[in-house]
Each structure stands twice: as structure tokens, then as C-alpha cells.
């Protein structure tokens, strides 16, 4: 890829004074991935009227949207017991302007590659957490006239739904339109910094997501697996291929005839089985699948529209490789479906109560860079599959038209997978998955041959 020249870095602060003070975070904000999640948008050459002022439009509208989403302009601050809070101090977000001698056509199919790194603002997690911006953006102008925009958002502050809420409102303000949905900022609705109200706890506590994922048989840790070289691929599934998979899953004895399996349950079950085959596990190898659930509509009452924060939790489906491979697709899909159905209002409250009672939350946090031997790891023999199927991820328009491609920036941890809706919105999907290089060819073979 052609070299990139970084022209200038700006600190963007809210355009008007905003509330300042210490902002308690909910338990779901403080566990799991608390690093930044990058998303990339690619645009064709803007029309002549936008040629000289793309950067200014982005900066000005970003400053304005931060007035409404002011927590994003603050900084995290560590507290005792592995907790942290948000210091709403309006220190601002980072905006980088860069140029490339390359062309957008150099990226071919836009699969995440190491070349994407220079298009994304980098975060040094060795710096004190109090100094790290929670939102970073980089606009890169290419020689062909096209541009890329990378947005890197702290997962300690928001989940994907909330991040895209902010980004879409940024686009609306840039186009001269009013805010569509005012963010709901009060995290006390999830008892942030407060005790839970009394509730009846079911007799069985089964939050497997707080347990250590299985190791390979014969291993006592995952240190060696973390070191192995990985590769990311984007694998499309057409609507007809999806229909074949769903027919397979729903035709099994494990299916509920009244409901059937969802796209996510079906595709994720297929991915899980294919990964077990590709990795060459022994039949008795335990394997866990991490599933990310949006709890907004599962709470009683549901969280308010525009809730701005983390409202997702991870649940786990578990089996052995032998069970998954010897049984039909419907078996894997049924394990996933059952894990998802377990997420009720009571389940969420039990999880919050459990975390509130922990002496230290650090063991549940992932603030570690690629190559680290610390933090949660859902690589071999495990997987984590996240759905972006219902996220409003397409159509980000700042005035010069919608992007022609958007997708994840990087996804370099073994076992990490995303299921994305295809950009043509015809019901087809794309699997973005990262596996060890040694396993990928076999995985791709099974992924398509087993449909």
C-alpha cells in the first residue's frame, strides 16, 4: 500500500459548555472489551462543492454532536477494586487528517488487512487511562479523490448500538438536519453506582460468561494459542445459501417447529461446527461459544429509546467438538438458541448483582493489545460470534453521499467473528472471521461444502 502522510491532529471539544463532573458507569460498561472498536467507511470522490471543506465539515459537526453526547468527550478514571468512572471534563476527542498516494481500488474487496492500520487512529494502551481519548476519528484523502473515515470508539463507554447512534447523528448534523434521537445518558437506570432494588433471584445461577473458557486438552493455559499467526477473511453467504442452512437446521429434531432458528443461530451454529472440524479437535474437546446479547428490549421495563451506554452482555453456549460434529446443524443452533432465551430481566439483574459483589473486576476486563497473554481469550478451542445484523451500520452521509463500503477495521484475535448484513440489503450476509492461518483453508472448505 502507498505510504500515508499524517497532516494534522486536532482536539475537538463540544461546541457549547456541557455538564462536568464524575459520571458513574454501569457494570456492563466495566467488563469485557474496554478497548476501542474501529469501523471504516469508504467514500467515492466528493463533488466539487465539497472538495476543499470535507475536514472542516467533519470537525464542525463533530464538535456540535458532542454537545449532546458529551460523555464521549470525557476521560476514564480508575477507581479501587478494578472499577472506573467517567470524568466528564470536555477534554475532547481526537481527529486526524491524513493523505495517501494510493487509490481506493488498491483495497480490492476491502477485507480487513494490516494495511488498514494506517487508516485508523491508533491507541496506546500503555498510556494512563486518564489520558486516552474515548473517541478518535481519522479522515484519509486518496490520490483518486476518494476518502476513508475511520471511527474508533471506546467500548467502555458504549456498545455498537450506541456508537452507531452517535455516528449517525454526527452525519445528520453535518447535513444540516436536526438531531433525530436525543441520547438517554443516565446510567442509573442500570443502577450505575447504586445498589440493586430487591428482586426474586432464581435458585440456579448459571452465568457461564464469568467462567474461564476451556483450554485445549492437555494444556493448562492458552499462552501458546495466543501466539499463533492469524488471518481474517470475509465469507459471503447468499440468500439461497442461507435458506439451505436454515432448512437444514429447522428440519432437525432439535428445532422448534413453531419458531424455527434465526439467521444468527443458524449461521453461528454452522460456523461453530466448521471451526471444530477445521481445528482438528479430539471428540472430547470442550468448546465454548461467546454470544453477545443486546438487553435493551429484554429488560422490564425496556431501556429508554436512545439509551447511550453498554446494554449488551455475553452469554455462553458450551459443548464438545465431538457432539457438535456428530450431531446435525440443528443441535448446535439449539444450544445457541437456548443460551439466548435464558437472557431475561432476572438473568440480567443476577449478572449485575454478581459483578457488584466482586472484590475486583479486572479479571473480567480486556484492556490488552494483540499479542498479550492477559485478558479474556476466545480463540482455539473456542469462538466468539457477534451479530451486526440489526445494527444501522449503512448509509452514513455527511453531505457528499453515502459510503460505498463499510466494515470492521481490524479483527485480529483468533476466534473473533462478526456476521454482517450485506450492503445490498437483500437478506444475504457476510461472515468476517479470524482464525489461525493453519486452520483457515480447512474452515473455508467446510464453510461452503457443508451448506
Curated annotation (Swiss-Prot):
Induction: Not induced by pathogens or by wounding.
Protein name: Spermidine hydroxycinnamoyl transferase
Residues involved in CoA binding: 160, 262-263, 294, 298, 387
Tissue specificity of this protein: Expressed in flower buds and inflorescences. Restricted to anther tapetum.
Active site, UniProt feature: 155 (proton acceptor), 397 (proton acceptor)
A Pfam family assignment: Transferase
GO molecular function terms noted in the UniProt entry: N-acyltransferase activity; spermidine:caffeoyl CoA N-acyltransferase activity; spermidine:coumaroyl CoA N-acyltransferase activity; spermidine:feruloyl CoA N-acyltransferase activity; spermidine:sinapoyl CoA N-acyltransferase activity
Enzyme class, UniProt record, top EC level: transferase
Coiled-coil spans in chain: none
Positions bound to spermidine: 33, 155, 314
Keyword Hydrolase: no
Family: Belongs to the plant acyltransferase family.
GO BP annotations, alphabetical order: pollen development; pollen exine formation; spermidine hydroxycinnamate conjugate biosynthetic process
Superkingdom of source: Eukaryota
Gene name, Swiss-Prot/TrEMBL: SHT
Phenotype of the disrupted gene, per the record: Glossy and sticky pollen, but very little changes in the exine patterns. Drastic reduction in flower buds of the content in N1,N4,N8-tri-(hydroxyferuloyl)-spermidine and N1,N4-di(hydroxyferuloyl)-N8-sinapoyl-spermidine.
InterPro entries according to UniProt: CAT-like_dom_sf (IPR023213), Plant_Fungal_Acyltransferase (IPR050317)
Free-text function comment from the UniProt entry: Hydroxycinnamoyl transferase involved in the conjugation of feruloyl CoA to spermidine. Catalyzes the three conjugating steps required for the biosynthesis of N(1),N(4),N(8)-triferuloyl-spermidine. Spermidine is the only acceptor substrate while feruloyl CoA > caffeoyl CoA > coumaroyl CoA > cinnamoyl CoA >> sinapoyl CoA are efficient acyl donors. No activity with hydroxyferuloyl CoA. Required for the biosynthesis of these conjugated spermidine derivatives, specifically in anther tapetum.
EC number assigned by the record: 2.3.1.-
